Amino acid sequence: MAVQRTFSIIKPDAVAKNVIGKITTRFEEAGLKIVASKMKQLSKAEAEGFYAEHSERGFFGDLVAFMTSGPVVVQVLEGENAIAKNRELMGATNPKEAAAGTIRADFAESIDANAVHGSDSEAAAAREIAYFFAATEVTTR
């Protein structure tokens, strides 16, 4: 297994519920290290740019509105098979379909307000990390 980096967002719904620490603990207990982290309020332009691949989809406006509705925590996670491990921890996109004990099953309300985002590939992880973090902001541990 290779050590990878992946990108994570703790979304506005989870930040509002004050479960940042609980979610972060899940990452760490699964062997993922947080090598960069910051809380920020996304601007409309930042959210539109980040989710540009969905710009033609019907839900795009609602997605941008949700992601700018409150602060988020953006993080870089590092560890063995980090991308797959993070996706397993998150659970299915729709929390009603997420396995018990996953982040979305435990902390998300709906497919729209689903607590977390995680990269789905190495290419996506590299792009998403670079979108929010300068190389000098990502540490090694």
Curated annotation (Swiss-Prot):
Keywords: ATP-binding, Cytoplasm, Kinase, Magnesium, Metal-binding, Nucleotide metabolism, Nucleotide-binding, Phosphoprotein, Transferase. GO terms for molecular function: ATP binding; metal ion binding; nucleoside diphosphate kinase activity. The active site is at 117 (pros-phosphohistidine intermediate). It is an enzyme of class 2 (transferase). Its cofactor is Mg(2+). InterPro entries: NDK-like_dom, NDK-like_dom_sf, Nucleoside_diP_kinase, Nucleoside_diP_kinase_AS. It holds the Pfam family NDK. It is found in: Cytoplasm. Its main location: cytoplasm. It comes from the Bacteria. It catalyses: a 2'-deoxyribonucleoside 5'-diphosphate + ATP = a 2'-deoxyribonucleoside 5'-triphosphate + ADP; a ribonucleoside 5'-diphosphate + ATP = a ribonucleoside 5'-triphosphate + ADP. One of its GO terms (cellular component) is cytoplasm. SMART domains: NDK. Its EC number is 2.7.4.6. CDD domains: NDPk_I (cd04413). One of its GO terms (biological process) is CTP biosynthetic process. ATP binds at residues 11, 59, 87, 93, 104, 114. Homotetramer. Major role in the synthesis of nucleoside triphosphates other than ATP. The ATP gamma phosphate is transferred to the NDP beta phosphate via a ping-pong mechanism, using a phosphorylated active-site intermediate. Belongs to the NDK family. This is Nucleoside diphosphate kinase. It comes from Pseudomonas putida (strain ATCC 47054 / DSM 6125 / CFBP 8728 / NCIMB 11950 / KT2440). The lineage of its organism: Bacteria, Pseudomonadati, Pseudomonadota, Gammaproteobacteria, Pseudomonadales.
